[in-house]
């Protein structure tokens, strides 16, 4: 999907958490990016719903990476009696896997984190666990 010559394109980056959970990180990287943002969605909202935000920020030089929660969108998992998870998996496995993918896809860019609703809360919780989680 193209967002225009100046804004870059959308790419799906495969990510695997340390426990084997696989999902895709949606990336919108403009040609002259100055910083990167790992965006954590609200509870129950698939990453793709934030593509308009990613396009707008890319137009201002921000490489945007949209995290996908377990059980939504590109995640291989779906909650059920035999498959559940909690904040521990999100904060210590999935978000760090996305952070590593961002660092690999956008080396040298200043890194920031943010989110919508529960995503913002979990971004703050991640910083509580690792004060350098979103640092350059």
Residue ranges of each PLM-predicted region?
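N-terminal cap/lid segment of alpha/beta-hydrolase-fold proteins
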Residues: 1-29
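Active-site glycine-rich loops that stabilize anionic/oxyanionic intermediates
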Residues: 34, 42-45
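Short glycine-enriched nucleophile-adjacent loop
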Residues: 120-131
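A conserved short beta-strand
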Residues: 132-136
